[in-house]
Amino acid sequence: MDHSAVRVQELNPAKLAMLFLKQFGMSKVAKGETVMLVSDLQTRREFIAAAFAACDELGADAYEMCVNSVPSWTKVGVPTIGQCKGTLEAAKAADLIVVFHVPLFTRWLKDVMDGGVRVLLIIDAPDDLEQLMSPPGLKEAVLYGDGLYKKTREVRVTSEAGTDLTYSCGEYPVMSQWGIADEPGHFDHWGGGHIHTFPNEGSANGTVVFQPGDIVILPYCRYV
């Protein structure tokens, strides 16, 4: 085993509950709400304990639903809720779902969001969660970008490395994340702060050149 590749956690584990309390507070978890924690066979148990403690402090009722799987980063759209009887109905009845694996492009996620359920994704390491807490002004900045992009119909992307890509947009919705799930029917990611969408079918044309510091996001999540 190459121990040089192992990342050592610097965050005091006792601070996790405080971080979750702050995050849940910004996500408007309130007294009397029901919070559903969707874990899997590899979810950090300290995250579950911290989530329970935060909900208890805020007066919310919380329970954990552990799915019998180990969801993969390289496969999206794989359902983890809905195959067992009653699980989708339970998810729809929650006020906030905290999910500890990527639920993107699943049918259950769309169903619960259409019903107004807030959904918060938590997948990063403890040290990253502390550093990536949503700062004041991030939501406003993201929504400003969201408004600009929704009016945009032609995009050109260039870089010093040689990227020169053009595409049309408007066929697919613009999705925005600002790090907290504070609005009904909103999906967010603790650590997120961006807008994203897809080009119109067949419109993308040009060259993309990767350079150090770039991130290839889903479904690969690889760093250059």
Regions found by a protein language model. Give the residues of each.
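Active-site bordering "gate/hinge" segments
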Residues: M1-Y223
